[in-house]
Amino acid sequence: MTMVSSAIPMVDDDPARHRFRVHRDAMTSPEIFREEADRIFGHSWLYVGHESEVASPGDYVRRPVGGRPLFMVRGAKTGQVHVFHNTCTHRGAVVCRHKSGNAKVFQCFYHAWTFDSEGNLAGVPGREAYGENLDFSALSLRPVARMESYRGFVFASFDENVTDLATYLAGAREYLDLVIDSADSKMEVVKGTNEYCIQANWKLLAENSIDGYHAVSTHDTYFKYLIALGTNLKGGVQGTARDLGNGHAVLEYAAPWGRPIAKWEPLFGEDAREEIAELRAGLVARHGEERASRMADTNRNLLIYPNLVVNDIMAVTVRTFMPSAPDRMDVTAWEIAPRDELAQLRQRRLDSFLTFLGPAGFATPDDIEALESCQLGYRSGGVEWNDISRGMDRAPEANDEAQMRAFWRRWQQQMGDAACKEMR
């Protein structure tokens, strides 16, 4: 008897049956991992950093983006922010060897070719040994194919034909604006980073970051801690989820445990009540009651496809995650805050950041354990599909999964026939 096989997408989207599934090979397959490097990370806008990290001419930061070594620098002559491939145009060694700093030039340690902060080739030892017709200007540092900034957030793409950043961000712009406009001064990245790895597929963190369904069960210890401090959680956590287009999604919900910027709760201490009330009054004066209330009283977990999360909750955390294997990702997180905020408010913000979202806080260890447990479970091979069907027959609520379906639909669209499964 002849066996008939057919290839079906790894994302099974069946609205008529209220069913949405993702094949677990998407989280375990080495072939999928290799295809993602080009199809996803080679053709999307990827977060590089914030302009405040390179505030002065010559300031730079070095980091991997989309699995490639890059560095961002503010040019000393033009004052413009550049993003370069971190590789010497001579023989390939990296030219920016430190994580951050300030430099007039970047010198390759291999043969001492030197480049200025605008990327121009500024020095070649023994230059007279090269033929007079060699075009040294063509040997300047290579910028990424595309680099654009949205209100201080710098993105790069390796695809010169990618749509412009504002169009790509689509509905996510509204939520970045809420973060930025909540401050009465420019936002800046607070010095220091959190860096850690998770032994799980990167897409699990994309899901987890906008998953309201897991909060009560996974973070039970944190909710008990809040209740012990006097927080009233009897009404639950109400909110909604939105598909923002292009794979971006958001979870927006009430903040019964308060927000250090403008919503006082007992855990902040009685001495902070008046100060936080003044902050709220400032929001109302600048933005009106309705928008100010949204900034002060609601939290947002924003996913910008494919691998940027902005958590606007007890503090504002910017987090990226990049796969290094099918079952491993490297995570980096920064805290951003108004540049001129009061010292005591900055401290409260950082305390909130570390208490919940830091790698030793209440939330992150819980989430890491959950994601690594999922990855371990996939090894059994006994179950083929993950179910992401919750809420398909109603308007999305905070504990539904519409926001995750938005991510997966975009992923399947970009992966195309590379993310299909032979079925018999």
Indicate where each model-derived feature is located:
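Generic structural signal for secondary-structure transition and capping sites
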Residues: F41-W45, A93, H214
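Short Pro/Gly-enriched beta-strand edge/turn motifs at strand-loop
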Residues: G42-A55, G126-Y130, N299-Y305
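Rieske [2Fe-2S] iron-sulfur-binding domain
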Residues: V54-E160, D164-E174
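Short, contiguous pre-domain boundary segments
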Residues: V4, P9-A26
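Glycine/alanine-rich phosphate-binding loops at beta-alpha junctions
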Residues: D25-V65
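C-terminal catalytic domain of Rieske-type non-heme iron oxygenases
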Residues: V73-G75, Q80, A145-E148, F153-R424
